[in-house]
């Protein structure tokens, strides 16, 4: 049996752009993708902290520093300045699931990684 677990998370990133007239996806600073272990074109779940919206899309890496841009229909689900949590998931067998720890990237107001951990303390946001 496989179990789906959180693999990676970029925590409370600031939306820097929202482009409705784009094909789709979420563009993310490639440095944040690398730090989190999220791959380009990987399916992600995005949660808007400001309005509670949750949606799935895929990532596009950008070389523009600090960019987190919602593209296409997703642009309707957040405004510039909203905080979002970007998460990817992976399937593990039961033995792998017992020891796996997700990678969590915390960012500042400029979407620069300030802390990278392989665990997350529940109840704390920083």
Curated annotation (Swiss-Prot):
Species: Campylobacter jejuni subsp. jejuni serotype O:23/36 (strain 81-176)
Protein name as annotated: Aspartate 1-decarboxylase
Subunit structure, as described in the record: Heterooctamer of four alpha and four beta subunits.
Gene Ontology CC, one term: cytosol
Record's function text: Catalyzes the pyruvoyl-dependent decarboxylation of aspartate to produce beta-alanine.
Gene that specifies this protein: panD
Gene3D superfamilies according to UniProt: 2.40.40.20
Cofactor(s), names only, from the UniProt record: pyruvate
Keyword Aminoacyl-tRNA synthetase carried by entry: no
């Amino acid at each position: 049996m496989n179990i789906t677990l959180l693999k990676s998370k970029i925590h409370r990133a600031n939306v820097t752009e929202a482009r409705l007239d784009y094909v789709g996806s979420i563009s993310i600073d490639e440095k944040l993708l690398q730090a989190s272990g999220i791959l380009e074109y990987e399916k992600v779940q995005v949660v808007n902290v400001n309005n509670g919206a949750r949606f799935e899309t895929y990532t596009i890496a950008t070389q523009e520093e600090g960019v987190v841009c919602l593209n296409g229909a997703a642009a309707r689900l957040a405004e510039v300045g909203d905080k979002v949590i970007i998460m990817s998931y992976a399937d593990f067998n039961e033995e792998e699931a017992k020891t796996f720890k997700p990678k969590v990237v915390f960012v500042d107001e400029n979407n620069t990684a300030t802390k990278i951990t392989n665990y997350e303390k529940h109840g704390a946001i920083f």
